[in-house]
Amino acid sequence: EFRSTKSGIRIHTQIDIATEIPVFYRITNATVHDVNSMDWFTYEPLACYVFDRGYFDLARLYQIHVLGAFFIIREKGKPDYEIVDGESLLEGTDNVLKDQSIRFKKKENQKKYPGIVRRIVYYAPDLHRTFTYYTNNFYLSAKDIALLYKYRWQVELFFKWIKQHLQVKQFLGDSENAVRIQIHVAII
């Protein structure tokens, strides 16, 4: 049963960046971790999926790769890796500091993601911060990878919109079903 005093839910969402419309969402209890929702999404070959670092799971990312789809995700932690190809430090062209092909060193990580992945370190001048991205897309430029990740912000704007405009400040019932119905109606 959901609590009436504190919103204990999560809305796991897959948004089409081109239309800014959710193509999938699932409402769960707040205890369900984001990474579990990766198993619920439908992945299409050649499509690109951009994830927050809370979704960093090498085995699941490898499954996306095996399905012929692309992923972009921010680095979580400092996984040990070896450089297969690429420069350790670039001249900062287009604010790209590193563009490397890497292989994970730890046996556990190699088992989860046995392939080669691309590691990009990008300086975002508007935020005065450096970001590290992992992707299996070796076709797009490093700058385009960083730009696609920046578009992930549309998900955050979607949730901000929900909170501001859908008036789901208090749930009308305490049961899980009541909360789900209220959120579904608000989104529709």
Language-model region placement:
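Single, function-defining residue in the core of a domain
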Residues: 2-188
